[in-house]
Amino acid sequence: METRIREAEPTPEVLAALIALSADWEAEQSCHGYRKNTAADIEGNRIFLLEGEGGLLGYLFGHVEQTEKDSSIMKAGTACFEVEELYVRPEHRSRGCGAALFRFAEETARGEADYMMVSTATKNWRAILHFYLEELDMDFWSARLFKKLEGCA
């Protein structure tokens, strides 16, 4: 199947399509605490759409921001493209669609940002680490782990 990726403006039609796809993502229950987007969640981000014969197959949105202070990872003022969301319909996963979306955003951000950054709350952390580390050649810099304490409200 032939697909294309393009950057899109947040028109009412684009926002409605992204919100509908994010509702599908929420229904999957594949990410801890994920809820469908509102227009406010998307506005202010750069939007990249993966389209094919079946319409909208996936999306990535994010934005460039400057780090505020020095950290063990990077110096203050470093420009980073923060990927807020990357989603591909289940029937189009494991076909290179997500990687293509990421690489398109990466090429678009080149020259504006020094790094690409992403956080994830997926329940399938092994697969997502493989995707970002092995397929997209990202570096692993930090992790945030949680444990529910028994007997706590």
Language model features: what each stretch is:
Residues M74-P90, A143:
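Conserved acetyl-CoA binding element of GNAT-fold acetyltransferases
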Residues E26-L49:
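Active-site rim helix/loop that mediates acceptor-substrate recognition in acyltransferases
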Residues A99, T122-S142:
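Conserved active-site alpha-helix within GNAT-family acetyltransferase domains
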Residues V88, S94-E107:
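Conserved acetyl-CoA-binding loop-helix of GNAT-fold acetyltransferases
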